[in-house]
Amino acid sequence: MESKYVLSTEKESKTKPSGRVNVSDMDSISNSLSKTSLGTRKVPTSLKTDASRSGLSSGGSKTHISDESALRMVYGSTPRDEKTTTTKDSITLAKEKEKKIEKRNEEIKLTFKAIRASECVDLLFIVDCTGSMDPYIEQIKSDIVKLQEALKLKHSFLDIEFGFIRYTDFDVASNRCSTFQFSRSTVEFVRFVSEIRAGGGADGPEDVFGGMDLIKSMKWRPNSTRVVIHIADAPCHGTEYHSMADSYPGGDPNGIKLDDLLTDIISLNINYYFGHINLKETGQMIDFFDKKTKEISRNKKSINSFDSKETSKMNERIFISIEESISVSRSVLTEQYLGHNIDGSTGKQRSEREFEINTNMDIDFGELPYIQMLQTKFKMPSDIVTCLSSSYEMKLNEITISIKIAPNPFSHGACRLAYLGIDEHGKKVVLKQSKYIGGRENSKKRYFESMECQTVAAKFALEFNKQLSLTSSEHQITFTVAKVLQMKHSEKPMYFGIETFINGEYQKYNSNCGWLKDDAMSEILQTFSHWTYQESKNKAIVVDIQGVKTSKGYLLTDPAIHSTDTLRFGSCNLGKPGIIKFFQSHKCNQHCKKLGLTIPSFTSSSSTSSSSRSTSSSSSISYSY
């Protein structure tokens, strides 16, 4: 964390008056008010009083009000000779909004460009092909087509090439290593792997460095998502990496250095995954590689690992690794295309916070201090269609609470860090913070957008549960209550998202760019997404469904909402193109039929029309994006 926590010794009121906020206008309220100095206008006494009560004056408690509300307060009681100015300001605001919409629509186009680019994947297998590895070589060969098909189902723009590096050990005098250059042909890939005969390996360690040294000789495509899957059951030579008998205890006999290998991997922007078969033998090496990679890259890269001992589960692990890599690439490319690598508030290059992941969830919070936070929570809207209006103001409540936060995050995604914490009642919570330093990423609006999205999704879920009239509670859909914390008494504003800790196996059921999990357990959640579009009168759809299956149903978090109002719900709102991507993949199921849901038909010139269907809609939906 770049700012120190500051504890308050002051006794303060825990509750704040409730207020309202139009989240999409939060970036314009300060600009609008700064253009209108209350001190230079003829402000009636009654208006000054209202401003003071609402936090517009320099003193008193503050509540959050929207741009629209603020302008009403400032201009509502102005003298007759100032009405012309007010009209001009309204016209200016309308023009500014038009520009914002145009800009956002262009950003959505660039986001889809990033999605397409991220699905250009170069997948390289590096495999120990000594005597004990036959079952794993065979598994890769038999799974490669299934892997490709599974990826195609999730990524409509997939363009994947496969490569292979085979290595053995120094007792194999000739042909110790060999390569298969990247190719789209699974037939050629299978032919190469079929000709491999496992052999060699007189001592325990193998020529790992020799295999890794060939990575730079592969013909990586420019800007591709680059993934290395390294499968091995033995470490490299050099006693600092293991405790086995070693014919080359001083390390690689050809003088290959680990730092050079890892520098190549980092400079090539490779996502490296080590599939260990015998962690007892390779664990020390993997940990050493990971630590050194983080050191050289300044925590921008790491060596990931997974258990590949069971050959039947290996393909699933590889699939997940590729998924993670595509997600990271998509985020990076989106930033590049949109220019978000420059912090909008400072004009400086965006930089990551310094952090170290600690996956230990058994934390002793006893010695950690409580930190005072201002907690903001939105009230659930009373009506779905109304809350989707561009002028809708979310009702909010504020309260001062105390939280203990773990010093290190336990997980991270493409954009956020996740910290474990406990509240003043001893309840486990998760605090989420931007990975990046800077005003754009850490603005109150950014956090409020996420909270608004989850609150509106929760309203959809509540109404969905009522309409479905399910007899079993196992299908009930619930979103955790999202809140925003602002650290009190810190030098600079510091925000966190906060939710109840979800205990269980976390799953993703669909994404915000068209992928849907195709299994029986996720059917009800795909129906939920479909239903939200119809229930909103074709204005919005809740996607990016993820969370935990519990005995009471589905407990979900971090949704996205695609809305025809592209200024709402943050950067994950991909507007009408995002809605279309869902229906290109969605297949109606028994739950859709029970609710009488219909598949919309999209054209570039019309909004939506409906036609019933129970199979894929990709052939009937067309829209230019």
Swiss-Prot record:
GO terms for biological process: contractile vacuole discharge; contractile vacuole organization; hypotonic response; mitotic cytokinesis; myosin II filament organization; regulation of sorocarp development; sorocarp morphogenesis. Residues 25-39, 46-63 have a biased composition (Polar residues). Residues 386-600 form the Alpha-type protein kinase domain. GO terms for molecular function: ATP binding; calmodulin binding; protein kinase activity; protein serine kinase activity; protein serine/threonine kinase activity. It is found in: Cytoplasm, Cytosol; Cytoplasm, Perinuclear region; Contractile vacuole membrane. It catalyses: L-seryl-[protein] + ATP = O-phospho-L-seryl-[protein] + ADP + H(+); L-threonyl-[protein] + ATP = O-phospho-L-threonyl-[protein] + ADP + H(+). Keywords: ATP-binding, Coiled coil, Cytoplasm, Kinase, Membrane, Nucleotide-binding, Phosphoprotein, Serine/threonine-protein kinase, Transferase, Vacuole. ATP binds at residues 570-576. GO terms for cellular component: contractile vacuolar membrane; contractile vacuole; cytoplasm; cytosol; perinuclear region of cytoplasm. It is an enzyme of class 2 (transferase). Autophosphorylation activity enhanced by calcium/calmodulin. Interacts with calmodulin; in the presence of calcium. This is Alpha-protein kinase vwkA. It comes from Dictyostelium discoideum (Social amoeba).
